[in-house]
C-alpha cells in the first residue's frame, strides 16, 4: 500500500537537498503510524538486520555481513531495520533503517556488532518508549549482552532461544 501520491524518485530528490539531516525520521514515521495503525492495541518494535548486495571499494561501510537468504557471509552492506508492529492488525510500518558499520569500522570504534545494535536502539529509545517497551527480534539477539543492553534502556525482548542455548534451573 502506498502512503503518498508521488513516486519514490520525487521523495528521494526533495529529501536529499540538504535536508536529510534535519528530518527526524523516527518521529516522522511514528506520526504516520499514528495515522494508519491502532496505537491503542498491542504494539512491538521489530528489529532485523538486512543484507544488501553491493560491489565496489569506495562505498562507505562496505564489508562482509551475514545473509540469511544465502545462509552465509556475503560482501555488501547491512541495514538494521526498526519497525512498529501492530500485532492485532497484523501490520507493520518501518520507522528507521540504520546502516551497520563494517567490521573494520567497528574495531576502530572499539565496538562489537551487538554493541552497535544496542547503540542504535539507545539512540531512538526516547521516542520508542513512548509507544511500547517490547522489542521483537530473531534468535541472533537472544544473547545475554544484547538482552542486558536493551533491558538497561527499559525494553523487554521477545525472541526465540538460539539453537546453542543452555538452560539451567536455579
Question: Where are these predicted regions, by residue range?
Answer:
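Residue-level detector of functionally special positions within alpha-helical transmembrane segments
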Residues: 7-9, 48, 138
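Active-site-proximal, Lys/Arg-enriched surface segment
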Residues: 14-95, 101
